[in-house]
Design a protein with these regions (language model features):
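Local beta-strand/beta-hairpin segments that build beta-sheet-rich folds
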Residues: 24-29
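Conserved C-terminal structural/oligomerization subdomain of aldehyde/semialdehyde dehydrogenase
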Residues: 15, 20, 32-299
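Short beta-strand to alpha-helix junction loop
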Residues: 2-11
Length: 299
């Protein structure tokens, strides 16, 4: 059974389309009684053979497995094709070859990657669950950031390290952040900067789990974050927050702060800032907004 009639219809429509395109569709179920099947929203377990990934245009949430075979040595290219689709909820890998593991770990853009284990039934606190890209992003259900996100309306809270870090090496401050802060203090000597909550990106953290199982948790920055503010202080604070997590700041071309100060910033900071023409035709993954409620509604 799937969640509702609409989901059933959408999944069945996809299966019918794949069959009409000439792809091999395999279905098997124990009970084929039409009357009993009509009493619920059932989809039989379905296997669809595809010649390549281009024939799959979207995620299909249901008991449908698409099978694509590839030749040895083509795995990196296949992973690139998967990443290009933009969806990245869960990926599973079964292999004894360490090189294959490292290839998938380094190239896969997914929220959860399971190696030599079950890919469903994520355990709270052990396997935080959440996707990447078009499959959704966020604090991950059951993860160490989840309760912090649920407490976003609490005025006094602090994000401490809720897990043990693999490496004992201290995390150095982003060089771009250092240069930007030095420029701010020189250009705006009276400004008081608020240090953003410390969120370490790009490092693996160990989570608890049963003996013989290893669970690694990594926080990755959004690639590009649009900064929208109505005054210099807020604009500076936003750029500080974006750079502090390793993201690339994006600003609108008519931004008064950027028009006035961009050329005086350090060259590396200028290179890191992405100036975009408009929001409708430009790429960015998140927005930081300082302004009143009406401006936010318009946005």
């Amino acid at each position: 059974p799937v969640i509702d009639a609409e989901a059933q219809q959408n999944i069945q429509k996809h299966i019918d389309q794949m069959r009409s395109k000439g792809h091999k569709v395999h279905q098997l179920m124990f009970n084929q009684d039409a009357y009993e099947l009509a009493q619920g929203t059932f989809i039989p377990p379905t296997l669809i053979e595809l010649p390549n990934l281009n024939d799959l245009e979207r995620e299909v949430f249901g008991p449908v497995l698409h099978l694509i075979s590839y030749k040895a040595g083509q795995l990196p290219q296949l992973l690139d094709q998967i990443n290009t689709k933009g969806y990245g909820l869960t990926m599973g890998l079964h292999t004894r070859i360490d090189e294959t593991m490292q290839t998938v770990i380094s190239k896969a853009h997914v929220g959860n990657l399971y190696i030599n284990r079950n890919i469903v039934g994520a355990v709270v606190g052990v396997q935080p669950f959440g996707g990447e890209g078009l499959s959704g992003t966020g604090p991950k259900a059951g993860g160490p950031l989840y309760i912090y996100r649920l407490m976003h309306q609490v005025s006094e809270k602090k994000l401490a390290q809720p897990y043990a870090m693999n490496s004992a090496q201290a995390t150095l401050e982003n060089p771009l952040l250092q240069e930007f802060k030095a420029w701010v203090y020189k250009t705006f000597p009276t400004i008081s900067l608020t240090t953003p909550a410390k969120i370490t990106t790009g490092h693996s953290f160990s989570l608890q789990g049963p003996t013989g199982e290893e669970n690694q948790y990594m926080i990755l920055p959004r690639e590009s974050v649009l900064s929208l503010a109505t005054n210099d202080a807020d604009q500076i604070q936003q750029l500080l927050a974006i750079l502090s997590v390793g993201s690339r700041p994006a600003v609108l071309a008519d931004n008064t702060f950027i028009l006035k100060h961009l050329q005086s910033m350090p060259a590396k900071v200028v290179k890191a800032i992405k100036v975009i023409k408009d929001m409708e035709s430009s790429d960015f993954e998140a927005v930081l907004h300082h302004g009143d409620a009406s401006a936010l509604i318009d946005l």
